[in-house]
Amino acid sequence: MRALALAVVAMAVVAVRGEQCGSQAGGALCPNCLCCSQYGWCGSTSDYCGAGCQSQCSGGCGGGPTPPSSGGGSGVASIISPSLFDQMLLHRNDQACAAKGFYTYDAFVAAANAYPDFATTGDADTCKREVAAFLAQTSHETTGGWPTAPDGPYSWGYCFKEENNGNAPTYCEPKPEWPCAAGKKYYGRGPIQITYNYNYGPAGQAIGSDLLNNPDLVASDATVSFKTAFWFWMTPQSPKPSCHAVITGQWTPSADDQAAGRVPGYGEITNIINGGVECGHGADDKVADRIGFYKRYCDMLGVSYGDNLDCYNQRPYPPS
């Protein structure tokens, strides 16, 4: 009786915690790249990922030809190993790079793990594509490459950590909720080159660091630096969706978006990040550079690019 009772309790827990998927739920995928069992429940053991498994049967985002795990075995660490990280950001520690030694794999993984939906939403290819897109956009923001650079221009991401090596404007706008601190500058720092007090303030609040009073932390603490980039990536700023929602297929364009030519794909992320400068006026070298990084990283992760890579014909979002 006791064994039977425990079995019933265990089944009840599964029933409460499981999320239906597959044919039993209209083809829905499990969250966090879990396997969908033949019975329509999500999990990561052989009961879910073995015989009859309906989707994401590799048991995580690290299926297929993905390089070996670094040992973390979940999330972004199951997609990109330390050695692959070094290959993708091949020259980030070059003597010519101002950020030499700053951007580490451990800081990248630690910051990513603070945002558990990053690289764990959707199927294995979607997870890989998100990693490629994030590293591509941030590589463009921090690039030290040029057309004839050794190993090509797209091997030089993460070369810088501060806009113009710190010789930049203050970037302070009057915002009562995010007041600028005396003597502080809010120029571009970190992988996403976070800029302006109205971004430093909420980013710091979200990650638990007072970046209004200590913006230099983004250029001195690598984990904090990466966290600001993931904050920007994961956070919608209306009317813009989050970059995460776009690359994982969770964003549906509104009527205004459709009228503006904004469509799902990597190009929409460029519009979110810097559309006012780069989008809506035809071919643009900066957009092409972002695409070049993205294609290289997708190729290294063994995943397709998806559609709509540029924003040449997308109208930028209105200023916030």
From Swiss-Prot:
The active site is at 141 (proton donor). Its EC number is 3.2.1.14. Residues 19-59 form the Chitin-binding type-1 domain. Keywords: Carbohydrate metabolism, Chitin degradation, Chitin-binding, Disulfide bond, Glycosidase, Hydrolase, Plant defense, Polysaccharide degradation, Signal. Expressed at low levels in roots, leaves, sheaths and meristems. Residues 1-18 form the signal peptide. It is an enzyme of class 3 (hydrolase). GO terms for biological process: amino sugar metabolic process; cell wall macromolecule catabolic process; chitin catabolic process; defense response to fungus; polysaccharide catabolic process. The keyword Repressor does not apply. Disulfide bonds join 21-36, 30-42, 33-61, 35-49, 53-57, 97-159, 172-180, 279-311. It catalyses: Random endo-hydrolysis of N-acetyl-beta-D-glucosaminide (1->4)-beta-linkages in chitin and chitodextrins. It holds the Pfam family Chitin_bind_1. Hydrolyzes chitin and plays a role in defense against fungal pathogens containing chitin. Inhibits the growth of T.reesei fungus on plate assay. PANTHER family: CHITINASE 12, CHITINASE-RELATED. Belongs to the glycosyl hydrolase 19 family. Chitinase class I subfamily. This is Chitinase 3. The lineage of its organism: Eukaryota, Viridiplantae, Streptophyta, Embryophyta, Tracheophyta. The gene is Cht3.
